[in-house]
């Protein structure tokens, strides 16, 4: 409940020109706390309210409300909730020190705090909230959690809006992939609408002829090399076809039409025919061997035959015929 009330108090502004006129027409150090006591930010159960009521009915305590120094000095002797001035622009302007980098402002800073007495030690003070008095307007300073939460909410809201807008932008094409902006085709026809507005008023300088030729040397050389390679590949393929076009890798080549191929037996037939051929048949293209001359045995009277000489086949046949005649 208290946090909800503090959250609502951070959003309001309070001012009362009538009370300013009743207090002399302007705010100063001795009436700033009493002007603050008229605002909704003030707590009636604080020590400030108790001391003011006691001073109204007790003459011995009246001097405590005449000056702010006396009033805050009396509050320091009490414990509980209190409101004190943390920054006085009039006192800052009256100081002779030149420690201020800028001119003193007219902003008053008032703190709401609790004081607890400790025996033999200084009082324990806990600041609950801070208020600003600008002119006759009173504001409540937001807490750190409120400031950080507001900034986070603003950032998240902006990111949510961005994601909603960006979710409809990406598109996918096989040529470019995922892109947020589809590639726009470049206009090539000068007769299209808007082409005249894109043209430059001044003549575009043309590149030199030498530089243009130098740029074309590379592509022309690459094209010539590709054409030469294609021609060489075609010639090699044609040569392989002419040399090995009639050969088969299978022993039994396939014959027939697609869908009804059969294995032929021409390979087996050719091997059988080759094995039956005589070995002395000269192959085409081979050199024929020389035919041996038959030897003729001549018997010379009075001369013994040479050792190691063997009768020929014709001599053996003649001897056999003679023996057969003698036997008859």
Curated annotation (Swiss-Prot):
Q: Keywords assigned by UniProt? A: Activator, Nucleus, Transcription, Transcription regulation
**Does this entry carry the keyword Hydrolase?**
no
Where does the record place it? Nucleus
One Pfam entry name: Med6
Query: According to its record, what are the GO cellular component terms?
Result: mediator complex
Mind telling me which Gene3D superfamilies this protein's record contains? Answer: Mediator complex, subunit Med6 (3.10.450.580)
Q: Which GO terms describe its molecular function?
A: transcription coregulator activity
Region ranges (Disordered): 173-212, 251-328
Which intervals carry biased composition (Polar residues)?
188-203
Name its GO BP terms in alphabetical order: regulation of transcription by RNA polymerase II
Broad class of where this protein is predominantly found: nucleus
Q: Where is the composition biased (Basic residues)?
A: 319-328
Annotated function:
Component of the Mediator complex, a coactivator involved in the regulated transcription of nearly all RNA polymerase II-dependent genes. Mediator functions as a bridge to convey information from gene-specific regulatory proteins to the basal RNA polymerase II transcription machinery. Mediator is recruited to promoters by direct interactions with regulatory proteins and serves as a scaffold for the assembly of a functional preinitiation complex with RNA polymerase II and the general transcription factors.
Extract the PANTHER family matched here.
MED-6-RELATED
Family, similarity comment: Belongs to the Mediator complex subunit 6 family.
Q: How does it assemble?
A: Component of the Mediator complex.
Which protein are we looking at?
A: Mediator of RNA polymerase II transcription subunit 6
- The source organism is Aspergillus oryzae (strain ATCC 42149 / RIB 40) (Yellow koji mold)
């Amino acid at each position: 409940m208290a946090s909800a009330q503090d959250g609502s108090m951070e959003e309001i502004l309070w001012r009362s020109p009538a009370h300013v006129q009743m207090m002399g027409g302007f705010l100063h150090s001795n009436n700033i706390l009493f002007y603050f006591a008229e605002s909704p930010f003030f707590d009636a159960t604080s020590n400030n309210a108790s001391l003011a009521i006691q001073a109204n009915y007790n003459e011995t305590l009246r001097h405590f409300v005449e000056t702010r120094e006396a009033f805050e000095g009396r509050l320091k002797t009490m414990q509980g909730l209190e409101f004190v001035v943390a920054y006085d622009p009039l006192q800052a302007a009256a100081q002779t020190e030149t420690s201020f980098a800028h001119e003193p402002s007219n902003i008053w800073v008032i703190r709401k705090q609790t004081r607890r007495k400790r025996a033999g030690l200084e009082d324990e003070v806990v600041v609950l909230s801070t208020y600003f008095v600008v002119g006759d307007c009173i504001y409540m300073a937001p807490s750190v959690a409120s400031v950080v939460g507001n900034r986070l909410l603003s950032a998240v809201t902006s990111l949510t809006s961005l994601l909603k807008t960006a979710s409809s932008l990406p598109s996918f094409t096989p040529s470019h992939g995922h892109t947020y902006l589809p590639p726009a085709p470049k206009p090539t026809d000068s007769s299209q609408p808007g082409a005249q507005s894109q043209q430059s008023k001044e003549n575009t300088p043309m590149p030199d002829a030498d530089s243009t030729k130098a740029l074309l040397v590379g592509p022309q050389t690459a094209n010539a090399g590709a054409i030469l390679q294609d021609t060489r590949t075609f010639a090699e393929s044609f040569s392989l076809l002419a040399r090995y076009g009639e050969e088969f890798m299978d022993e039994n080549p396939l014959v027939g039409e697609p869908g009804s191929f059969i294995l032929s037996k021409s390979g087996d037939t050719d091997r059988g025919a080759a094995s039956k051929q005589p070995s002395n048949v000269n192959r085409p293209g081979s050199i024929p061997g020389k035919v041996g001359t038959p030897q003729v045995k001549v018997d010379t009277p009075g001369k013994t035959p040479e050792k190691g000489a063997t009768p020929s086949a014709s001599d053996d046949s003649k001897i056999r015929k003679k023996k057969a005649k003698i036997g008859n």
